[in-house]
């Protein structure tokens, strides 16, 4: 059973979150950027062992639109995460971020390391660090040269959209690249995406954001145990790009999920949930 709850964040904006599952809490922040949290589902069945607290970022899903559009920015979303932790009454928490919210969670970790027990970054954007996410992209694409859709999808991945309608067309053409297998589950997830995005939240996420040159050093000193999950076939970030992050985060462990893309819990739910649960349940080193 899933319930929706609400709280007032640091600036008074009412934010919504979903609670589902059983077990210790795992706070989950969605990516997009600007995408409602519904796309995370139950993270491949992770709700069987964890109580998932799934945040709808401001202006998305069931959360309210903020009065100030500048608060859509990635570092302000990190402030929302801290407000949610305080609202939940958690002294420390386990935190999971996917895609764009990987950046949110890295900023949060740098600002509030004492509030984290464990951190899970799934296919995180590296933009807040000023690092490339498309390292060896040509090699990743070449590995999928046998797919019937590869030429059209690869062209759409880097094409410039003429307007909003064209953007959606290109998004759907490129969608197979985001999954390990372009099957019914992948198609259903991709088809649901357009309705889940809030344009203002997407546009505002990186607006006027400049990476802090001190952030890599602060994260390198982070002692919080961190799991990095990369999809073997992901194009953004590639598994090669994720090795940069693993080298930076000295307390991290990188796992590359075989046959997975940008949404590893869709490609192989059992493998994803088992990997994350094993990490969260492990005894402290």
Q: Where do the PLM segments sit?
A:
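Conserved alpha/beta-hydrolase "acid-adjacent" motif
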Residues: 235-241
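Active-site loop/oxyanion-hole signature of alpha/beta-hydrolase fold enzymes
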Residues: 57-100, 274
């Amino acid at each position: 059973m899933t319930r929706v709850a609400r709280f007032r964040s640091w600036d008074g904006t009412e934010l919504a979150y979903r609670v589902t599952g059983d077990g210790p809490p795992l706070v989950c922040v969605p990516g997009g950027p600007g995408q409602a949290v519904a796309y995370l589902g139950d993270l491949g069945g992770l709700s069987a062992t964890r109580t998932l607290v799934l945040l709808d970022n401001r202006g998305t899903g069931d959360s309210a639109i903020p009065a100030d559009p500048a608060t859509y920015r990635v570092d302000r979303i990190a402030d929302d995460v801290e407000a949610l932790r305080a609202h939940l009454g958690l002294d420390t928490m386990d935190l999971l971020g996917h895609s764009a919210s990987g950046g949110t969670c890295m900023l949060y970790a740098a600002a509030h390391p004492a509030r984290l027990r464990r951190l899970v970054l799934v296919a995180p954007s590296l933009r807040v660090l000023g690092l490339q996410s498309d390292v060896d992209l040509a090699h990743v694409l070449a590995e999928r040269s046998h797919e019937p859709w590869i030429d059209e999808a690869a062209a759409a991945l880097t094409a410039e959209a003429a307007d909003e309608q064209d953007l959606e067309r290109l998004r759907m053409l490129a969608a197979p690249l985001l999954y390990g297998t372009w099957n019914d589950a992948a198609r259903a997830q991709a088809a649901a995406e357009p309705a889940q995005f809030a344009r203002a939240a997407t546009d505002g996420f990186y607006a006027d954001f400049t990476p802090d040159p001190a952030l890599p050093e602060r994260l390198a000193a982070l002692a919080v145990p961190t799991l990095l999950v990369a999809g073997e076939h992901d194009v953004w970030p590639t598994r090669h790009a994720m090795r940069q992050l693993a080298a930076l985060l000295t307390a991290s462990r990188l796992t590359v999920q075989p046959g997975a893309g940008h949404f590893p819990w869709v490609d192989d739910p059992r493998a994803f949930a088992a990997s994350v649960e094993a990490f969260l349940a492990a005894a402290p080193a």
